[in-house]
Amino acid sequence: PEALRAAITPRTKLLILPYPNNPTGAIMNRDELQAIANVIRETNIMVLSDEIYNSLTYGPDRHVCFAEIEGMKERTIVVDGFSKSYAMTGWRLGWAMGPKEIMRHICKIHQFGIMSAPTTAQFAGIEAIRTGDDDIARMRDQYDLRRRFLLGELRSMGLDCFEPEGAFYIFPSIESTGLTSEEFCERLLHEQEVAVIPGSAFGASGEGHVRISYSYSMNHLREACSRMRKFLENLKQEQK
């Protein structure tokens, strides 16, 4: 809360909260959200809460919508979509919820700037809502297995790794290799044909890390980890 309070200036109009988080997989529990809300109440700031990974959490703390926090419903715009929960990436179908006056302006911009989502995507979204909840549960269980597998593998390689509790990404530190995140990714791709994302793509604070997605099959993840382990072993030999 103190860091947030210190970052707010008279020019601050909006706080963006993306959680569960991409790239770290971090979530926010009710106490943490309440602490943020306490700071927001001291200001006139609105909150844009990006909760597109809300169905994909794995620890004891389940997702809490920021608008549920007392006094925040009138100050919050929630954005969500079908891409992650229903595995509909590419359909580009989502929604927003917020105070009536703000939504009126959002609808105007959307109506005359974007028109509407394709009809086929809308029908697919309707069917997902009607019949897809069991699939979400099965998918979440599979993601959890992959998450725990990947966390164990990366740590066994000697990489420091924050345990993700949401989304489907893991964000290990690669500082011990002596490479920048871009160098690491380029070499891993060219030498072992494994693609990961440099942490620098997410800003200066992401440097020294790489983002790995576990939205692939266990067979793909096992093979990727085997190749990544070989890459790190070769790198150690090279640096001796």
Protein language model features and the residues they cover:
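PLP-dependent class I/II
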Residues: 1-240
